[in-house]
Amino acid sequence: MIVLFRQWLWRGLLLAACLPCLAMAASIQALNYSSREVDYIAVENPGNTNSGGGGDSIRPYGQGGSICCFSVPEKWHADLKVVVVYQLSPDPTFHRETVSIPPYPDGKGGDIWLIVYEDGSVGAVVSLYGPSRPEWPGKIKGYPVPTKEYRDERRKDKLKREKNTLDFLEKRLQRDFYTLSDEKIKEEKEIIEFQKKIVQSLEGNVR
């Protein structure tokens, strides 16, 4: 009886010791809180470059898609780390950063979220909940939102492109005017007028 009890106790201790090692499949999500394009972002286990998953690209202040799969422990432990592999445009360099995973919210495993911050640093969390939930363990709460400065720069860039298009259309009509039919000239003028409205609308939004 004592021998059986010792065997049962030993098995229980072994099982308890292995609990942190039990793994679960996790989808890979990515968030970009920066104004730079993320050309590539993926995740690996430390010391094992063949354990990677991901490879998404993300626009500035954007979110990547859900990519399968990566393995994470069912239970969080204090030395849990992953390696984030990433490339930020226009720099062609691939960076590898080992980051610590904070405690799982509610003690539950979930997707692994790779995060790029405004200063170019990276992080990762494992969470069953998204960034808009109060349980979200990330440093920044909520999904990425473009800054006013970034939105203004995008408008200026778009205005410049639309002005270049208008200039091209006007010069093309001037160049080909005497070779076009009346119907084609009318059509070209309508296109130019429409393009002018686009430019005027953008000029009203750019300060």
Regions found by a protein language model. Give the residues of each.
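Structural motif
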Residues: 28-36
